[in-house]
């Protein structure tokens, strides 16, 4: 099976949608830049949003903080050793591992195979996987329904 990979997603707490993500063979600044660029190209008005993360070195980096500040995004970090602040993303990671990875580890012989499986899973998670918290809809459907009802 393929070795280690690092997934860096942005999860919208409104509907649980994975807004942007990147998978890399190492945790690095390029991975975080790509993830942010994907999020910024998908959503234009980000003023006042809160970006919460753990205290990983990538999220403490000056360039990362500057990019958030340029878009008017407020940076928030969990205190050290406080996993409860990150329970939403940790829950997503647990669901992804349970539904996409566990029992299939030996299928992913290359990074490309793992990347494709995660891309397919995130599409499924956003578009098809229903959740009771959002009225038994998928994250995308919930957002679309909310917007159409709001307008």
Predicted regions, residues:
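Charged DNA-binding/catalytic regions of mobile-element recombinases
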Residues: 1-151
